[in-house]
């Protein structure tokens, strides 16, 4: 019978790409991990890893074993959590959440507050994180819940081994200086804003890609992207103080932003989906956190 500890080591090596990376993460020596994996290969009766330069990758047999090992290890984690909850008489455990900035403020923080009242024995640890980092961290059990985003026309990678649930959908709104001539209308044609300087996230981000695409496809122009920051609050301040424009989601704007005009594009709806990503097997504590995030998300977007 295969040892769960060795299966965990195999999954860690697969996730990190090197024996040395797994050793650093787990606090073992590389030789100790190599010895344990050699035993696992003997138990499996076939090679599980092959070297590619300085890295290692799974053989076909290794891929089969890691897939089943993930199911087994997630099941063990869930069983241990349920036993702890039964022993305590209530849901308990540590749940680690990752989220992008605006969801952290509008969804995660309110959910943590409600969990403190409803489930005081759940310890929530939360960090700002981009969704690209989430899937490996979820598989390696470094993260339990990820709140991610997906702009229209820019689909995220599909992870069939993880569970994705819809949380909310936001509008992307045009944010202008209050005294801009187009701010007088309820809806603003993007084409009328070709002469504006713009503030957007850094190159290579989903927001930047969305911004360029909207200006090109709806407005017919190449935007003058003069200001860059991955902090949406900085982008709002740049609109307020420099006369720039921005395209920002509802979660950033909240119930309103003083000193700026917030309008919908006249050409039609542009949006962003916000979703929850977890392992397929959820502990009672993770399920409680997911429920709290869903409830907080239902109240997070403005009624305008």
Regions inferred by a protein language model and the residue ranges of each:
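A late-sequence structural motif
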Residues: 107, 261-304
